[in-house]
A protein has these predicted regions:
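Bacterial N-terminal signal peptides
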Residues: 21-34
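TPR/TPR-like (Sel1-like) alpha-helical repeat modules
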Residues: 189, 193, 231-235, 240, ...
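Alpha-helical adaptor scaffolds
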Residues: 254-266, 299-306, 313-367
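Short coil/linker segments at helix-helix boundaries
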Residues: 38-56, 60-73, 82, 93-152, ...
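Amphipathic alpha-helical segments of tetratricopeptide repeats
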Residues: 78, 190, 197, 247-248, ...
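Boundary/linker segments of alpha-helical solenoid repeat arrays
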Residues: 82-86, 155, 203-204, 252-256, ...
Length: 419
């Protein structure tokens, strides 16, 4: 069907595995929420984005106060029942709050060992899932009505693409439905292209197009065929340029465009450029725990182990200050610190920080067992077999997440001897 010989299934699997990382980055980019810049009321955007109420709600969001942001966005939606973008902001906040609870907001998982090939099962409460689906459908329906009434409504096209993009991110990260999500991502791009045709200065619309341009250019033809986007073109540098334009001139997508830009530069190992973008975000929002964590992650990725260790420790130090961060998921910082110390051959320190990650009260079972497995490996390298066995037993215990069980059982039989 695809012109591949029967004995080439193994190379094909390798191609798909390599490209899963790129797909994961596509949806990771859809996760960065919007924050309106200070702009002039004549900006090419829905007027609601320039109101103090929306700005205040985003302030709470960017301090990772999801409950405070949700309360405010719900009030905005109630006061503006015909605003699709207001509905989209409620959708965004619900999705982010849930992904935070699931430890799915550390982009290291998207840029490296892809969650798409993991065995992890993510459980979402039915009421939460139902509300996310309802909000998505409501936002799209509102846009459909507005486009029918006015085919030149750029705001409606943009808001529809925004809702589709958010939903695509959700079903990818939670359900691993990346084929369906890729099609939604393409629909989001189409909506953005239409918004730009109507208003060439609608800078926010360039973000979805830029993401698709880069991601599609990174995929070989076989994978495009498999996910049904064979007619879509892509160009990496054009995609990056579009993201830069949205970051510079967008009202709604300036922050998420920078986040996407940083992720894609990271994907292509352009670490100094990625770190420069991410450091700008961390400086602009020093109380955003995720931006600070990502700055440390990128420092690690560019090969500056000592610098990354110092960056992770600064995050932990700030987290000890009263009210500096809101509900920081410190397990992600401890895990990143341990990984970096492991790479620097600081084995005892790595073991301790894997244990710290596992001990965090809000750590998901999935991340806890990953930390326990890694702690066991460190104890084996330290020739502390009894401690290693204890960690492997916890990582392979019945019930809960089983994604680390096979490796843990293997090391129960034979001590880990790698690095």
């Amino acid at each position: 069907m695809f012109g591949i010989a029967p004995n080439s299934s193994r190379p094909r699997r390798r191609i798909i595995k390599r490209c899963v990382k790129t797909l994961s980055l596509l949806f990771a980019c859809l996760l960065a929420p919007a924050y309106p810049q200070s702009g002039n009321p004549a900006s090419h955007t829905d007027p609601i984005n320039l109101t103090p109420q929306v700005r205040e709600a985003h302030d709470h969001f960017y301090n990772l106060d999801y409950d405070g942001a949700l309360t405010r966005f719900e009030a905005i939606q109630k006061a503006n029942p015909q605003s699709a973008i207001a509905t989209g902001y409620v959708l965004m906040t619900l999705i982010f709050r849930e992904l935070s609870h699931q430890d799915l907001l550390d982009t290291t998982y998207y840029a490296h060992d892809s969650f798409l090939t993991s065995k992890r099962s993510v459980t979402i409460l039915p009421a939460t899932r139902d509300r996310i689906e309802s909000l998505t459908n409501s936002a799209i329906a509102l846009c459909d009505q507005q486009i029918k009434a006015n085919p030149n409504d750029a705001n409606a096209y943009f808001a529809r693409g925004y809702a589709r993009g958010m939903h695509a991110a959700f079903i990818t990260l939670v359900d691993h439905s990346y084929v369906s999500a890729a099609k939604q991502g393409y629909a989001s791009r189409s909506d953005s292209e239409q918004a730009l045709r109507i208003d060439p200065d609608y800078a926010d619309a360039k973000m979805a197009i830029g993401i698709q341009q880069f991601a599609v250019a990174s995929l070989p033809r076989i994978l495009r065929i498999m996910i049904g986007i064979t007619g879509v073109t892509g160009n990496k540098e054009k995609g990056l340029d579009l993201l830069r334009e949205a970051a510079a001139h967008g009202v709604v997508t300036n922050v998420e465009s920078r986040t996407a830009l940083s992720l894609f530069l990271r994907h292509d190992a352009r670490y100094p450029e990625a770190l420069a973008v991410q450091s700008g975000l961390a400086q602009q929002y020093p109380h955003d725990y995720l931006f600070r964590l990502e700055e440390a992650n990128l420092t690690k990725d560019k090969g500056d182990g000592p610098g990354a260790i110092a960056a992770y420790k600064r995050v932990l130090e700030d987290a000890r200050k009263p009210n500096y961060f809101i509900d920081p998921r410190l397990q992600m910082t401890y895990f990143g610190l341990a990984d970096t110390q492991r790479g620097q051959n600081q084995i005892a320190e790595a073991a301790q920080n894997y244990l710290e990650a596992a001990a965090q009260p809000k750590c998901t079972d999935w991340l806890r067992r990953r930390a326990q497995l890694n702690a066991g490996e460190m104890f084996d390298l330290l020739h502390q077999r009894d401690k290693a066995i204890e960690q492997y037993r916890q990582a392979s215990a019945g019930g809960g997440d089983q994604s680390q069980a096979d490796a843990a059982r293997r090391y129960l039989k034979t001590p880990y001897a790698g690095r």
